[in-house]
């Protein structure tokens, strides 16, 4: 199964780490005994393919035309899903967009790169959900450009109430591929 293979890839690539003594400082500012490094997973073709495959099967019944998120982390995730979707069904052209952390200070000064049109429906993506901050920033930027954002996909949901609550307040339904608990409960990691 692709899900089990992806979980194993996290362990084989050492993209899931545990350090109960010192922990890890997360992008949210929180400290956690667990660290999930999706950049490593998305840097390998096989595991990137597994992510895209799982995402495609989760998303194919939804109605949206765009996939995007914050630079840099969302780029391989959005393009991988978009490419997989097109190969699986050439009628499905999920275009991608990238939300810059800051608008460019030259050229057109864009905050969002990609071909977007007000009224289109967009899916926002991120690697890991803790507080939901990155998904929310991407959704706010997309909505400011007239896009409709109703769903957010993450590779790993850390299953913290704050993230789900923050997304719910923004009317964004969470679609996780994996949970932290699934990574923790799978050999060789079981402690």
Regions found by a protein language model. Give the residues of each.
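Active-site-facing substrate-recognition patch
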Residues: 1-62
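Short helix-loop-beta connector
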Residues: 60-65, 117-119
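PRPP-dependent phosphoribosyltransferase catalytic core
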Residues: 2-12, 140-191
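Short, glycine/charge-rich flexible loops or terminal/linker lids adjacent to PRPP-binding catalytic cores
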Residues: 77-123, 133-136, 188-190
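Short acidic, glycine/proline-enriched helix-loop-strand junctions
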Residues: 61-62, 77-94, 165-180
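Short glycine-rich phosphate-binding loop at a beta-alpha junction
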Residues: 63-73, 153-154
